[in-house]
Amino acid sequence: MKFSICIPTLNEEKYIGGILSCLEKQTFRDFEVVVVDGESVDKTKEEVLKFSDKYPLKFLKSPQRGVSFQRNFAAKNAVNEYLIFFDADVMIENDFLEKINNHLEKQNIDILTTWNKPISDKPVDEFIYLFVNIFMLELIKKKSPGAVGVFICVRKKSFDKIGGFREKVNFGEDFDLAKRLHDSGFTYALLKKPKVHVSVRRFDKEGRLNMIIKNLRAATYYLRDKNDFIDKIQGKFKHEFGKF
């Protein structure tokens, strides 16, 4: 099989069905799904298991709660050539995996990510993601490639070689992974299409102005010193997993 789709969850009963339904409709079928749960107290497990007869599916209880730990645990239990990390609240088009696979067939790529689009009609949300796409992905990649954790596709051998996500990093772990892969000589690609459709629930909780400021501050730290960027921002940004 080609892809192992890894999804960390924590109390995602309202959202997880969205991405799992999208996966059911994919035109490209060569994949398994590995959901790693951080001891949800809602009906996340029940929602996930509704799809157990739709495609190869593993639902695993994580020994430890944390988005990076859960992603790494999913990767350890994955068996395919490429790992795809999705957040539990994203949506994708029916031909998303087909387009990703076509790109991988044409080029020898170790890590791949895409532009994102908000699941929202609000102009401010479009602006925030335009900023993320153009500034934090397109422009910054000239200094050092980055990735947004809502979708990362990475060759499993490459991921394993660098030790996966750093589990003590609670903000910026996605950019950290991309940087360490790049620094180790692995190849990178950023696609404008197909886009991942991303929930704006964090915007609703934290406030849009706060999210803009947070991203600007993070980008400033990165541009000042990409080598120590991750270590410098730890503790400076509140970014909780599963707190919605």
Residue ranges and their predicted role:
Residues 62-78:
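Glycine-rich, basic loop-to-helix element that forms the pyrophosphate-binding segment
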Residues 37-46, 64, 90:
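A conserved acidic beta->alpha catalytic loop
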Residues 95-124:
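Conserved donor NDP-sugar-binding/catalytic core segment of glycosyltransferases
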Residues 113-150:
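Short, flexible, basic/aromatic active-site loop/helix in glycosyltransferases
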Residues 12-25:
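Short, well-formed alpha-helical segments that are part of the catalytic scaffolds
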Residues 43, 88-102, 179:
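Acidic donor-binding/catalytic loop of UDP-sugar-dependent glycosyltransferases
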Residues 171-177:
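Acidic donor-binding loop at a coil-to-helix junction in glycosyltransferase catalytic cores
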Residues 83:
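Short aromatic/hydrophobic "clamp" motif used to bind/position activated sugar donors
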